Amino acid sequence: MRLLVIFLLALLLMACKEAPKPLADPRTTKEIIVVTHNGPSTYYYSGNNQYAGLEHDLVRNFVRELGPEYSVKFLVVNNISQVIPTLLKHKAHFAAADLSITRTREHLVRFTRPYQKVQQQIVFNNELTKAPKNIKELLNRQIAVPSGTSYSERLQRLKEQEPLLSWTETPHANSDELMAQVAEGELDFTVADGHLIALVQNYYPNLGATLALGKPEEIAWAFPKTGDTWLYEKANAFFTRISQDGTLNHLIDRYYGHADRLKPVDVTTFMQRSETLLPQYKRLFYEAQELTGLDWRLVAAIAYQESHWDRFNTSPTNVRGMMMLTEDTADRLGVTDRLDARQSIIAGARYVLMLKDLIPDSVHEPDRTWMALAAYNIGYAHLQDARILAKRLKLNPDRWVDVKKALPLLSKEEYFSTLKYGFARGGAPVVFVESVRTYHKILARREPRHTPIFPSFEVANLNGFGNTLSQE
């Protein structure tokens, strides 16, 4: 309890160094100021001349719901430890920063209804360390967590059971950086939320997660405890609506739906081949982007999922080449040699573009691209059946998060017997799309964009919300 009081006093002192000036009423200024911090779950630059992140998209949707006259300004602080002090100084109307609801924080701010549950876990290097089985195995080891996080609160409670437990708090390193240090052998353990671990494991496959620490925590937006409650009430109403109409699930799937699709060995192999095989074909992927407008890294991800960048790959059904084209598709696209890497890559990219054009205008990005990839794998006719089935099941046929629930049902007689195109192995396109999404994310982090000398196409934004397109 004494430590809790000290922590609260420290936060209040930080907030009171400057005399807080009242923030202008947003109903007058029509501007909503939101404090957040950089991170994969909050707010980041996606590389497509767009900002992205689950919190970013939620805030954009919320402000859009307030009315067209309202705008949003993001106040981005260096790390999570600065978020609540900034809010207490009245520099923002609320905080959208992947904040867990904790006892300490509830003394300082007012939380909205939660919109996500997360589980804290111990992160370790599975090449250097055995998974700890209990808290005792963390003693006398190097543990670090970011300052000002709920992780340190959790460790403090564990210390009551194991007084010898010790750790350091880093004011300038976030969870991403600390997990990277664990992966590189510079740190024994850190603590992170499961959804963040799943994302980072796609870049560091040697990371393991174990020991669920306590019960799952809830994530919410934070508002000042005092002052007018108009915006707070609007935010609660917003979360009630998006929880009921599927928008929240749609956004969560956009950022985390593909995160745990691949096994560590898949990621390791992909990274190795990115170093050895990808350079041979990069020029061809660049050319495919220049001809179609598709991000070259997306085309490369499709090619890897199809053939592992093996231009001689052939299936038992005679699907062949880098992009695994059927004879019929190759003929329609004018391909004379499916084993020719250039012909295959460019034809495959053109085919994805053709499929995107077939999809109704009601389907926006990035869902439009994910559905085109599903059609690439299973055929456009079966995709249409899945969309029809989704609608029958009271799901949204324009959202990938719902269509991917309907696709596996195409293999069940009670469903496929009622559809025009009948049976299909609908689970395959779900695996295909989610794997491509993950490979694309990895490449987008590791490889720079390609900017043609004479850009003539717009590249779909596959990170942020909505159907925004940005010139690359």
UniProtKB/Swiss-Prot annotation:
<dbReference type="Pfam" id="PF00497">
    <property type="entry name" value="SBP_bac_3"/>
</dbReference>
<dbReference type="InterPro" id="IPR023346">
    <property type="entry name" value="Lysozyme-like_dom_sf"/>
</dbReference>
<keyword id="KW-0732">Signal</keyword>
<comment type="function">
    <text>Murein-degrading enzyme that degrades murein glycan strands and insoluble, high-molecular weight murein sacculi, with the concomitant formation of a 1,6-anhydromuramoyl product. Lytic transglycosylases (LTs) play an integral role in the metabolism of the peptidoglycan (PG) sacculus. Their lytic action creates space within the PG sacculus to allow for its expansion as well as for the insertion of various structures such as secretion systems and flagella.</text>
</comment>
<dbReference type="GO" id="GO:0009279">
    <property type="term" value="C:cell outer membrane"/>
</dbReference>
<dbReference type="GO" id="GO:0071555">
    <property type="term" value="P:cell wall organization"/>
</dbReference>
<keyword id="KW-0472">Membrane</keyword>
<comment type="similarity">
    <text>In the N-terminal section; belongs to the bacterial solute-binding protein 3 family.</text>
</comment>
<dbReference type="GO" id="GO:0009253">
    <property type="term" value="P:peptidoglycan catabolic process"/>
</dbReference>
<keyword id="KW-0998">Cell outer membrane</keyword>
<feature type="signal peptide">
    <location>
        <begin position="1"/>
        <end position="24"/>
    </location>
</feature>
<protein>
    <recommendedName>
        <fullName>Membrane-bound lytic murein transglycosylase F</fullName>
        <ecNumber>4.2.2.n1</ecNumber>
    </recommendedName>
</protein>
<keyword id="KW-0456">Lyase</keyword>
<feature type="region of interest" description="LT domain">
    <location>
        <begin position="260"/>
        <end position="472"/>
    </location>
</feature>
<dbReference type="GO" id="GO:0016998">
    <property type="term" value="P:cell wall macromolecule catabolic process"/>
</dbReference>
<feature type="region of interest" description="Non-LT domain">
    <location>
        <begin position="25"/>
        <end position="259"/>
    </location>
</feature>
<keyword id="KW-0961">Cell wall biogenesis/degradation</keyword>
<dbReference type="GO" id="GO:0008933">
    <property type="term" value="F:peptidoglycan lytic transglycosylase activity"/>
</dbReference>
<dbReference type="InterPro" id="IPR001638">
    <property type="entry name" value="Solute-binding_3/MltF_N"/>
</dbReference>
<dbReference type="Pfam" id="PF01464">
    <property type="entry name" value="SLT"/>
</dbReference>
<dbReference type="InterPro" id="IPR023703">
    <property type="entry name" value="MltF"/>
</dbReference>
<dbReference type="InterPro" id="IPR008258">
    <property type="entry name" value="Transglycosylase_SLT_dom_1"/>
</dbReference>
<comment type="similarity">
    <text>In the C-terminal section; belongs to the transglycosylase Slt family.</text>
</comment>
<feature type="active site">
    <location>
        <position position="306"/>
    </location>
</feature>
